[in-house]
């Protein structure tokens, strides 16, 4: 299981489009003020688990609370949880929380998004968010927290395979 955070904002919109030759493409693009959202979830071969969005930056305390309330119930005995090197992940309490289910923690090498299949899932998620172009914080949070249905099992297996992991 891979765990990571990403950001989303109320100003996300498509930057490119198509139109018939000779016709100008016009669409509204937000400028000025926007609100940023932090999104965290886990990725398994079977799909996305424990999606949660926060309207502020991730802290160690928030990450620990998310682990206990949202991720821990989805973990199976002996799972390996792979984290990146965000400072919030390095808290000693993280290993304690995961040890309650006999799970071990592995950290990715620094600056190695190519080894993290959840980055590919986040790429698809952000394209989906740009398509929807949600402008309100509650609407964006609702979309993010219901995103688990967006990812099929075969697609998640492909994310893992693209990063060089065996999916059998």
Descriptions of predicted regions:
Residues 1-168:
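Short functional hotspots at interaction and active-site rims
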